Amino acid sequence: LPSTRQNAEGCGTQTAGLASSGATGPAGPAFLNTSCEYNGTGWSGTTTKNTPGVIAEAVFGTQTAAVAAGGYNNSGSTVNTVEEYNGSSWTAVNTLPTAQRSGMGCGAENSGLVAGGEAATVLTNTQEYDGTNWTAGGAIPAATYNAGAGGTSQSNSWFAGGGDGFKNATLIYDGSSWTASGNINTARDQHGGAGISTAALIFGGRTPPGPAVSSATENFDGSSWTTSPATLGTAAKQSAAFGTKTAAVYAGNDPAANITQ
């Protein structure tokens, strides 16, 4: 990464990815309002957003059509601001109906969603986005935040694990409702996710009883999870994750770092 980041979020592919916002950490962190692009071998520049810096926003889409929604600002407020990225600049668009931080962003710019997250309480709602407007989707069965997630559209979105507490559940969205699938093998939160609901990957995060940070990876085939022999080179959490089941990226760490793996 061009600079150290923690609590950043990402989207895109291993050869065309995006990391957005986050903080410089670890003590008295500066909250960032910039993004940077990844081409598979290196990062390029930074692009400034219109709204003040946040951590723990929900990000989904691609490097040239991304959405960044909500987050937590350095004034201690959970926000409902939303911006879209076109590959060169950010534009403020319609706000979230419900402000959130640490929710799961899934899908594409014109077929995306934010599931769960935190505000005054941990949330169960799904907020769907069609590229212009936000509408209410199907509620998630249990209030959740900080889960690994993925999907390239609303209808192949998923998330696994997360808080409140260390969860092991996997939920898959069909465009209107969430359905439980096979549990992950090791409950975790603050981890990364990549891929779609039939071919997914989770990696890193915290595992019980905490605050141990993991380097472990699990693979999903649409019904069950298996522990992968491949592990992160550096145990990491709360970083920008993007890619597919077979080609994923995890950038940053907490405390803040500039590593990419």
Where are these regions (language model features)?
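Polar, enzyme-active/binding microenvironments
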Residues: L1-Q261
